[in-house]
Structure formats: structure tokens, C-alpha cells
Amino acid sequence: MSAGKRSAAGSARSDTATSTVDLHASLLPLAFLVGTWRGEGVGGYEGLDGFHYGQEITFAADGRPALGYVSHTWWADEPRDGREPGSPLATETGFWRVQPGEDGKPVVEVMLAHPFGIAEIYVGTVTGTRIDLDHNVLIRTATARDVTRSVRLYGLVEGCDLAYAIDMEAEGKPMQSHLSARLHRVSD
Ligand code: HEM
């Protein structure tokens, strides 16, 4: 990935993300994420029937040192449990930022809020176009589902699609896959 052009103000426009807004220089390692992505994923968990879902994610840069993030999902399977194709599923929103690590490598910090009583922070690494969010703390309300930990992996596949996998430890069950998806870019 190219380092992009830096302006005197300390912000930069990425050569890889063709966003028309300035990308803060600290976010260059995440430049490949900027834009809107859409696609399909599969979900499941121990004791849960597998399902398909649709998803749209936007990573937005506005010149400040964090990307805004919002994800919407919808049911993409046969009707089940009162859900029809297109019925809204999980939404999450938050911010992604990059800080210099002790060894000089960029550290990614991701703050997410979920509408079902859970907020979480991930800390991880970015290596080229692969992001490992492997440290996670999660807080939840007394009525939220019993999720204790989660890890995520994001990356570009075949140079253009955004793929991710999310594993979680929930309801006393061991860490295992809950979601994975592959999304294509629909706008910069
Ligand atoms: C792409 C985003 C997501 C989608 C499409 C999704 C979808 C689903 C669906 C369809 C179910 C089963 C039906 C239901 O109980 O509602 C489910 C269960 C669950 N989800 Fe998610 N989910 C998403 C994100 C998350 C996240 C971020 C967490 C945790 C922070 C989470 C935690 C859970 C838990 C704990 C269960 C119950 C598992 C069990 O019954 O043992 N989900 N999810």
C-alpha cells in the first residue's frame, strides 16, 4: 500500500482509498477500508441453526484521527422465527483509530456499541491489508446476552473484497465462530 500524499496540515489523502475526504495521516494503515461495502455472510453458533445474512458496512473518514464505522445487517434466508428475507438483524456502530505501538508497528483500536446492551473495545494489529483484532474487552448490561469475549479478523481477499470472521465466547460456550462474510466495495 502506498503511503499517500501528506498535506502540511498533517492529514493525508490515500492513494488506495479514493475517498474524496481527507484521511488523517494516522489512519493511512486503514485507508483500504474507507468506503461502503456490501455483501453476504453466514452465521452460526453451537446450538444455533446456521443462517445467511446481508450486510452493508461504511468506514467514513472526515479528516479527524478516527474512522466512523456503521454496520447494518438483514436476514437473507428462508423465513424463520418471524424473520423474512430483508428483516433487519444486528447493527453496530463505532470508531476505528490507529496508534503507534511500542515496536513502531501500528496498533488498531476499535470501539463498538451494540443495541443489545453490549459495548466493546478491541485492540489489534494491521499488517498490510490484514487486521487482527485479538484483544477484546466487553461490557454488558445485566439483561444482555452473556458474551464474555470476541475476536475479529478482517482482510482484503483477491485484492478487492473485504472479508472478515468473528469468533465469540458466549453463554458459557468456548470461543467459536459466530459470523463470517465477504463484501464488495459499492462506493468510495
Ligand atoms: C453481523 C452481525 C450479527 C448478526 C447478523 C447476528 C445474527 C445473529 C442471529 C440471527 C442469531 C440467532 C437468533 C437470535 O438469537 O437472534 C444470533 C445469536 C447471537 N448473537 Fe449474533 N449477530 C451479529 C453480531 C453479534 C455480535 C457482535 C455479538 C456479540 C457481541 C452477537 C452475539 C450473539 C449471541 C450471544 C447470540 C446467541 C447465541 C446462543 O444462542 O448461544 N452477535 N446472532
UniProtKB/Swiss-Prot annotation:
Pfam families: THAP4_heme-bd. Pathway: Nitrogen metabolism. Heme b binds at residue 178. Its cofactor is heme b. InterPro entries: Calycin (IPR012674), Nb(III)_bact/plant (IPR022939), Nitrobindin (IPR045165), THAP4-like_heme-bd (IPR014878). A motif (GXWXGXG) lies at residues 35-41. Binds 1 heme b group per subunit, that coordinates a highly solvent-exposed Fe(III) atom. Keywords: Heme, Iron, Isomerase, Metal-binding. It is an enzyme of class 5 (isomerase). GO terms for molecular function: heme binding; metal ion binding; peroxynitrite isomerase activity. It comes from the Bacteria. It catalyses: peroxynitrite = nitrate. Coiled coil: none annotated. CDD domains: lipocalin_heme-bd-THAP4-like. Forms a 10-stranded antiparallel beta-barrel structure able to accommodate a hydrophobic ligand in its interior. In fact, this fold hosts the heme group, which is located in a wide surface cleft. Heme-binding protein able to scavenge peroxynitrite and to protect free L-tyrosine against peroxynitrite-mediated nitration, by acting as a peroxynitrite isomerase that converts peroxynitrite to nitrate. Therefore, this protein likely plays a role in peroxynitrite sensing and in the detoxification of reactive nitrogen and oxygen species (RNS and ROS, respectively). Is able to bind nitric oxide (NO) in vitro, but may act as a sensor of peroxynitrite levels in vivo. Homodimer. This is Peroxynitrite isomerase.
